[in-house]
């Protein structure tokens, strides 16, 4: 997966980069994991117009992403790596051995056909999800929970990664891409 740097033709494009999606699977999204996405037309939650020239844009389907990764110790096979119009990161369709299908954020290095797993039995490799206390210090992580069982809230964008700096009792020090050090409970995934 290559990253293309944009030329600074306009101020909005200065420093901008895009993923070159040459190795994505050209398949339809899983119908059971998509819902229609209603456009805001430049309105806020009261219905007041906040952006005068904002229109509907291209029709999109929202892909339901599994940010919690709560199917523990059940292996899954990566069926496809797909484009998601609603986020900068690509997504991976997982087929679990019990027959369930779920989308996850696709980390760098995940390929079609790989086996992934969430839980304490999982090894350290792209696509697996473990509790922060079970990871070695210095490893790069993404999709980090702030509260146990709430689902990933930090470091979900494409190309970003946080680093586990230290473990101290029940809490762990995580360095975010901004350079900020956060204390996160070791039971979080």
Predicted regions: what is each one?
Residues 1-87, 108, 112-189:
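Basic, glycine/proline-rich low-complexity segments that contact nucleic acids
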